[in-house]
């Protein structure tokens, strides 16, 4: 039996943009599908785009008809789920062999679907939205299993625990709820206070988990967003990532930008060695931050050509894709450039 290929050693300080493609309209989300062949992106032209980096081919998928921020996949990589600002949940064939239109569409929420997640075993779908609800759906037939209530503000993000038995949800005020999937029971409430602010001048809340995921063993929950907000109306604040101990709910560390940067950590990734990566964007432009597990401030950062609005780690864990306001998808490798 042949040995499995070794994963190249990562060196964040050598991170470089290796490939990019112009979609041509501002992008708001991006995801690698589980096999790493395609990248999908939600765009402000009301479409979802599929890009195959190996060939450079891009395809505009028909049928979203909305801004799509929420993208998820079945574990086998055959089906993509998207949620848009119109409240519709869509099932798509990933490869395009069965067409480039949704295979199924349901009216899932009143208003914007903020997040979509698929259970580790691929049998359930979770969605959350501006209607303050979380809904659990049967993956196979799209039927509603149950609705989870309790949040008092829009539910920005959700994540299934790797054990498949729990679901984490976080709202605008960064209240974090731990749900039992089998019963729908709310097991406990946590909070990441640093990721929420109230602007007395504009009488507005700002914050929430703009990105959220568990690490591989489920011991920690990473939450990306904005902190130290000085103007809620203009969204002026600094990007941050909070790491919570999932068992105790304790805030382990808050990763911050060393220098002033006005923006939000829209997308985050966790490397196998615990390194935290965040794609930040705002009025200061676009920046990729790299933190060591115990580092308050980044040990490296990479300036991007334009505002970064999402980031997702590739299945091989050596590179990531970012979506940008200038309409480009960019793939960056966390290894040294190959010698020519």
Which residues make up each language-model segment?
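WD40-repeat beta-propeller superdomains and closely related acidic/aromatic-rich repeat-like regions
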Residues: 1-340
């Amino acid at each position: 039996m042949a040995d499995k290929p070794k994963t190249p050693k990562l060196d964040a300080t050598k991170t470089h943009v290796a490939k990019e493609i112009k979609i041509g309209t501002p992008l708001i989300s991006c995801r690698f599908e589980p096999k790493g062949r395609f990248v999908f992106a939600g765009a402000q032209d009301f479409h979802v785009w599929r890009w195959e980096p190996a060939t450079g081919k891009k395809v505009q998928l028909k049928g979203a008809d909305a801004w799509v921020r929420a993208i998820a996949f079945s574990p086998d990589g055959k089906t993509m789920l998207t949620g848009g600002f119109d409240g519709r949940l869509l099932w798509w064939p990933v490869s395009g062999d069965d067409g480039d239109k949704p295979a199924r569409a349901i009216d899932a929420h009143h208003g914007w679907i903020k997040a979509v997640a698929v259970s580790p075993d691929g049998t359930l779908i979770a969605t959350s939205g501006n209607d303050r609800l979380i809904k659990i759906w049967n993956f196979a037939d799209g039927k509603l299993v149950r609705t989870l209530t309790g949040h008092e503000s829009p539910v920005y993000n959700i994540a299934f625990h790797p054990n498949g038995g729990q679901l984490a949800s976080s709202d605008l005020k960064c209240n974090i709820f731990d749900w039992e999937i089998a019963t729908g029971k709310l097991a406990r409430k946590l909070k990441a206070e640093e990721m929420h602010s109230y602007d007395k001048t504009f009488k507005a809340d700002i914050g929430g988990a703009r990105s959220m995921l568990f690490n591989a063993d489920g011991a920690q929950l990473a939450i990306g967003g904005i902190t130290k907000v000085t103007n809620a109306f203009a969204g002026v604040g600094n990007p941050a990532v909070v790491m919570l101990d999932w068992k105790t709910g304790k805030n382990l560390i808050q990763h911050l930008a060393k220098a002033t940067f006005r923006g939000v950590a829209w997308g985050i990734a966790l490397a196998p060695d615990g390194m935290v990566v965040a794609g930040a964007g705002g009025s200061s432009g676009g920046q990729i931050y790299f933190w060591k597990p115990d580092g308050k401030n980044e040990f490296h950062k990479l300036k991007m050509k334009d505002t970064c609005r999402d980031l997702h780690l590739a299945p091989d864990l050596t590179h990531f894709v970012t979506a940008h306001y200038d309409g480009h998808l960019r793939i960056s490798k966390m290894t040294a450039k190959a010698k020519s």
